[in-house]
Amino acid sequence: LHLSIRRQRQMCIRDRYYGFEYQQDLARGYDGYEDLLTTGYFETELKKGESIIFSASLDEMGSVKTIEEVFAASIARRTHKIDFISCLEHSARQFVIRRPGDRTEVVSGYPWHGVSGRQTFVSLPGITLEQGHKEDCIDALDTLVREMRDGMFTGNASAAVAADAPLWFFWTLQQLEREVGGKQIWKAYGPAMKDILESYRRGVGGRVALHDNGLVWAAADDVPMTWMNALIDGRPVTPRNGYQVEVNALWYNAVCYTLELAGKHGDKA
């Protein structure tokens, strides 16, 4: 952790505290013990009207000018929490995370949850498009699409094998189409849409199959295939093996939407 302050300073000696217990983490089955480092504190004098920029980062921030530029950009992005709606908008923005390597991800929930394809697709319209941040929506979708394998979303996205997650992708694109138009959707995401449908037609990892009746069958003993994804001793509490109603509703929507865009833009493949 890199700590810096924009002026001469004095930093007191660090120390370490041992054996912190987190009862909620233990109750949820997580490792609930941790040692914590205190970095001490900066000590300096301020005159009337002066300001100080303090930074904490995983990488070195660089020059004082760089820190000032980052600080100014951060201030410009902030929302003014003056009423209920602005507080909601501010909270929603905290779930959109930009990471190194041109990655934009959506955290499913603080403090325990990571990145989930399903939760990303379901939440993106509300936390980006409704606030006028379509570029964030596009960046998050592009991050997941770059890491697609065999029609499923992998990378850092948890629940990558769930049968419904890739199909929520189509629903999110339908919301994005209102902002950018169908032509751009098909140009940017048409190949991914066709890859997903083709993977379901072929079958995915012995867990997802398209049957002759046109319905999607999803079943597995070791991983949850739907949003009911609680595990006990490494096995799904509610497996729901078979024709899940929401999976097939999403499947029907995905097929219809893909055919609609393909027809409008002359793609017969």
Where are these regions (language model features)?
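Single conserved hydrophobic/aromatic residue that forms the stacking wall/gate
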Residues: H2-I5, R9, I13
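Short Pro-Gly-centered flexible turn/kink motifs
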Residues: F42-E60
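Aromatic-rich carbohydrate-recognition surfaces in CAZymes
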Residues: R118-T120, L124-T226, Q244-N248, Y252
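Short acidic, Pro/Gly- and aromatic-enriched capping/linker segments at domain boundaries
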Residues: L26-E45
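Active-site neighborhood of glycoside hydrolase catalytic domains
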Residues: N248-A269
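Extended glycan-interaction surfaces of carbohydrate-active proteins
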Residues: R16-Q24, G29, I52, D59-E60, ...
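Exposed beta-sheet edge/beta-hairpin loop segments within beta-rich domains
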Residues: G40-K48, T238, G242-Y243
